[in-house]
């Protein structure tokens, strides 16, 4: 009986994870909306990852300083 209940709970969790994936794709924000674009001072924002707005590459100069370089 416990095995059946465990199997049911595991399959319900897997199903809920599969259902959540398509919804997340629709919730992705552009770099401007999430604050990842800082073209005026050419600094990389931590939220934008290794990308910069003007298609420059983000170079980490130190732990506290990352700049967008060509």
UniProtKB/Swiss-Prot annotation:
UniProt signal peptide: 1-20
Propeptide span(s): 21-34
Cellular compartments annotated: Secreted
Taxonomy, superkingdom: Eukaryota
Tissue expr: Expressed by the venom gland.
Any single GO CC term annotated in Swiss-Prot or TrEMBL for this entry: extracellular region
One MF term in the entry's GO annotations: toxin activity
Cysteine pairs bridged by disulfides in the record: 37-53, 44-58, 52-68
Protein's name according to its UniProt entry: U2-agatoxin-Ao1f
Organism: Agelena orientalis (Funnel-web spider)
